[in-house]
Amino acid sequence: MPSCGKIATLTAPVPAPITENKPLHVVSIGGGTGLSALLAGLKRYARGVHGEPVEGAYEVDITAVVTVTDDGGSSGRLRRDLDILPPGDIRSCMVALSEDEGLLSRLFQYRFHSGHGLKGHSFGNLFLAALNQITGDFAHAVRLSSEILAIRGRIFPSTASNVTLEARLADGKMVAGESKISQSRQAIDRIFLRPAGCRPLRETLEAIERADVITLGPGSLYTSVIPNLLVTGIP
C-alpha cells in the first residue's frame, strides 16, 4: 500500500492544440464540494447533450471520477441501511454538470428537514438509492440519473466496491471511517482502503487512458483526493 507521507507530482505530455473536431479530454478526480465546484466551471466549455456548440474557442469532454468513502450524514445512513455506495458526492457532481439549473437540479439537492426516517436525506440520494435497488448496479443507476439530469459529461464512482477509508495516525492509532478521520486532530501517517485491492470501472480506465488533462481536487487531501488514488489503476 503506498504511503501518503509524500505527494507525487503528475506529469503528462502537453496536449495537442484544441481543434473544432477534437475536444480536450479532461478527467477530474476528487470528491466533496471541491470537485462539484470545478465541474460547474468546466461545464460551460462542454458541448450540450443534444450537440449544441459551446461558447468561445475551447471545448472539453468531461469525465469525473468520484470518491466513494463518505460514511457520514445521509450517504452514511444509506450505506448502512441498504449496503450501497454513498450517493452524496456523486449527486452533487451530477447537479454541477446538469444542463437544467432550475427545478430539477433544485429537486435533486433538496434535503428533508422533518419526517421520521426522512429528515436529513436529500431527494437525489434517495433517487440514486432507489435506482440502485431497481437495477442492482450503482454505476448504472448513476448513468440513468445522469441522463435524466442531462449532464454535460460522464460520472463514475472510483470503484464499485463498498470500501472503508482507514488511517494510521502519527501516534500509531488506527481510525476507520472518513467522518472520524476528518474529525481527528492527530497528523495522518498513512491512508488505506479496506478491503484492499479494489478495482476501478473499465470506463474509468479508458477515460484516463485517453485523457489530455487529469485534475486532482480541489478538496480535502486525505478524504477526497487520495482515496481515489488508492484504487488500483487510478491514475
Regions found by a protein language model. Name each.
Residues 55-138, 147-149, 154:
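Glycine-rich nucleotide/cofactor/substrate-binding loop typically near the N-terminus or early
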Residues 2-26, 33-64, 126-215, 220-235:
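Conserved catalytic alpha/beta core of Sir2/sirtuin-type deacylases, generalized to analogous enzyme cores
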Residues 31-34, 69-70:
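Short polar catalytic/cofactor-binding loops
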